[in-house]
Amino acid sequence: MAGNEWINGYLEAILDSGGAAGGGGGGGGGGGGGGGGGGGGGGGGVDPRSPAAGAASPRGPHMNFNPTHYFVEEVVKGVDESDLHRTWIKVVATRNARERSTRLENMCWRIWHLARKKKQLELEGILRISARRKEQEQVRRETSEDLAEDLFEGEKADTVGELAQQDTPMKKKFQRNFSELTVSWSDENKEKKLYIVLISLHGLVRGDNMELGRDSDTGGQVKYVVELARALAMMPGVYRVDLFTRQVSSPEVDWSYGEPTEMLTSGSTDGEGSGESAGAYIVRIPCGPRDKYLRKEALWPYLQEFVDGALAHILNMSKALGEQVSNGKLVLPYVIHGHYADAGDVAALLSGALNVPMVLTGHSLGRNKLEQIMKQGRMSKEEIDSTYKIMRRIEGEELALDAAELVITSTRQEIDEQWGLYDGFDVKLEKVLRARARRGVSCHGRFMPRMVVIPPGMDFSSVVVPEDTSDGDDGKDFEIASPRSLPPIWAEVMRFLTNPHKPMILALSRPDPKKNITTLVKAFGECRPLRELANLILIMGNRDDIDEMSAGNASVLTTVLKLIDKYDLYGSVAFPKHHKQSDVPEIYRLTGKMKGVFINPALVEPFGLTLIEAAAHGLPIVATKNGGPVDIKNALNNGLLVDPHDQHAIADALLKLVADKNLWQECRKNGLRNIQLYSWPEHCRTYLTRIAGCRIRNPRWLMDTPADAAAEEEEALEDSLMDVQDLSLRLSIDGERGSSMNDAPSSDPQDSVQRIMNKIKRSSPADTDGAKIPAEAAATATSGAMNKYPLLRRRRRLFVIAVDCYGDDGSASKRMLQVIQEVFRAVRSDSQMSRISGFALSTAMPLPETLKLLQLGKIPPTDFDALICGSGSEVYYPSTAQCVDAGGRLRPDQDYLLHINHRWSHDGAKQTIAKLAHDGSGTNVEPDVESCNPHCVSFFIKDPNKVRTIDEMRERVRMRGLRCHLMYCRNATRLQVVPLLASRSQALRYLFVRWGLSVGNMYLIVGEHGDTDHEEMLSGLHKTVIIRGVTEKGSEQLVRSSGSYQREDVVPSESPLIAFTKGDLKADEIMRALKEVTKAASGM
């Protein structure tokens, strides 16, 4: 058609497809074509006859293929508004009485509206990025002012110099980075015997016959982490590598994915022999429904179950490795490395529980994906989040940034353009903080993880590179060889081709919309010289029936088939349905023999592992200019970069390489010459060298705690840090405190504790029954002294009461006492359960208020094995000598305080949070001095309706480099800030790691509402009983702002590990719920 007539052709096709799947407005106006209101652009109005007012928004890639949607996309992407306007004028001018013309006119309005909506979204994206950059600059100025107060003039100038280095050439940047490396990893480290943990949660992970391309979760990341585990296990100094993933016991997938462990390699052979646990292993941890294979977007509510299961395995393995290589001392992970957002979230929690360094690799980032989908204009933000759980994914990435020591990226572009979008990372602020740390100047709790570029590795041992061939022998192998001697996949590919001896253009990826295969087919179909000179080979995963594939993949494949038909590419395009992983090298080899080219036209490619594979087989490359391929092309110098949206540029680049034999040979030789830069040994050496720079934080108490009660006397001289501090206190202040021991009783709750402790110390087995002391205290008195270590070490069950019952003023209500008493009655009603069980109280209140509450209910503190106070900022053991000072007063577990002190600055948090909380709220926020402690900053909240949500506060805190845990508590009357590693849920994991009481043997008693950390306590392997009716309201309304992730992304909607009470608050009802959840959990 001449001029703009072809637009009418599209519109006619739209009308003809009125009955297509998902058809929209009346009159066949077409399904996916509708884009909201039918209002025209510019000065136009809405045609009253238009059905567009009720039309649905364009369908996203997750929906079934719709030809209407396809045609509309063609118009919206490729037509200028003026063209649409001229077409509309023509339709109006030739109007007749037929309904078809009226519908055609209406469709013009609707498509015009879509085009303008797309531009509006682009403008909103630009404004959003601009506003964010402005806010970042303001934060940098504020942070620089805060930090500059501690620097001398010369140091200030040095810091400015650090910022100025942002504009230095790339070469200088790399030189400076490598100069900071420690000595490169070598054979001299073989005595280290390291244990490394990798986590890749989603997809189907196994060592052999990987089903890459089966779904969008089983792609290049799966192959990468498996090969990384194998390669690391072969490095000197690495004893064991565990790759954690989810266990899948579903009939939908192969039985091998349900095996708890799978050996990848037995490890390096250094002549000294290896222990039975050496090597690399896949460890599969169950979480969520055991009989279902879940896509990654559905895994978020079950992450804490995975954490608890992984933690149990790590502790068991640490003991086993200790027996094998460390004379019985625990061998904790050298590093915990999370891959992707979900595994990053898990790694952050595991790292915090074990106090070991964490490393993160993002692979594909949520903020970047959100921006890309928003630019397409097909889905609203709400639809994007519903489909991809994108906001929960972004929060997972932010949490991982909070905890990570090191972030490994594949490319420099990933650092500058992708991680730079996150609240938790700022390139300039990271340099300032690193400069201060080098000079020994306090950063006031501010921290930014270090970003390093380490390109992924590849195993080249099985790569067979074809020898250089002369110009005229492209098809000689096929003429000489019989069909039986050729690899089967060659025959499968060549059966599609009329002339299989032409050069091949190979694309290998999943049929995912972001891989941009359809644009490649268009480029090939519309370039006649390219069609005449080459064949196109599309390896798009494995399929049996397109209708049985996921909707997004099916849509891409259907579009590809329609394009092949449109351009009549039969005989020039091969698209086999099946291939094995072992066939991939043969496909590369075939392409190389035919003097072909490999192309990766993805919209954004985080790295581009297939580009490395292709280069190793001697193939020149054409690749997207967005993402990792830029660095790969610069390193290998073996191809061309293109704009993935420009199909003409794609066709020109392919034609240039295929037609110019000299250029083809040069690119081939360059790729083969430089490919060792991407070998696995080189990758692992750089990786281990970088990891060695992380600060090792293994807690010393793990080495000092005896394994059982009988070992206490043997290790009496190996007192922990707490024992040393006890001795020093007693030596210095015993005389002062001794004079007041016989004074009149005091109303101070601490004095009550002191009196109880004195009775225990003076008691003997003979007079225990006559002493009015708690039952647990009487048990401890049988030895004539307090326990050196908490009774938690010998408990088989722990009942944790974490009911947040507070009045309007934030003080504890009598309902909380009632819950405690009824739980005690319920557990003690079963004599067998009572003998093996202990109790813990977990609250946001400080210790003095907690003790006053217990005193009010006449509950001795020693009835509890542990008190978790201040929102998890302190842990006490009332019946343990280590937690009682010389004056008989309770004091917190000092090892726990050392544990959570990581990246914490009380003064830095106090100043920053006070400034943020007061911003725009006048005097609504005031310090709560009585609730503060060295690891908790507390503020009064006068009006909860005038404060920012936790989401908004976290965003601002992260932008300033502070890493901490914020929560509103006590009926939203307090804002409390505790260290990153502290929280009520993490305190339970600390008790597991410290004293060996498994989280799976804990019972959590909570109300229906609570503090803003309430929902994060509900998930995990512990059993939870929710008591109805005891908490009328909590602080949950301040957790999230609009547009954030939802509660169901954190807490599973249904879980056998959660039970509810019914009716009144009675011990019998609590016991019924406890038995119900125990029975349900045993059937998992």
From Swiss-Prot:
Keyword Cytoplasm among record annotations: no
Catalytic activity, EC: 2.4.1.14
Pathway: Glycan biosynthesis; sucrose biosynthesis; sucrose from D-fructose 6-phosphate and UDP-alpha-D-glucose: step 1/2
GO biological process: sucrose biosynthetic process
Top-level EC class as recorded in UniProt: transferase
Reaction it catalyzes: beta-D-fructose 6-phosphate + UDP-alpha-D-glucose = sucrose 6(F)-phosphate + UDP + H(+)
Keyword Cell membrane: no
Tissue expression: Expressed in germinating seeds.
Region (Disordered): 25-61
GO molecular function: sucrose-phosphate synthase activity
Activity modulation notes: Activity is regulated by phosphorylation and moderated by concentration of metabolites and light.
Skewed-composition ranges (Gly residues): 25-46
Pfam families noted in UniProt: Glycos_transf_1 (PF00534), GT-B_Sucrose_synth (PF00862), S6PP (PF05116)
InterPro entries, per database record: Glyco_trans_1, SPP-like_dom, SPS, SPS_C, SPS_pln, Sucrose_synth_GT-B1
The protein's role, per its UniProt record: Plays a role in photosynthetic sucrose synthesis by catalyzing the rate-limiting step of sucrose biosynthesis from UDP-glucose and fructose- 6-phosphate. Involved in the regulation of carbon partitioning in the leaves of plants. May regulate the synthesis of sucrose and therefore play a major role as a limiting factor in the export of photoassimilates out of the leaf. Plays a role for sucrose availability that is essential for plant growth and fiber elongation.
Similarity-based family: Belongs to the glycosyltransferase 1 family.
Oligomer and partners: Homodimer or homotetramer.
Protein name listed in UniProt: Probable sucrose-phosphate synthase 1
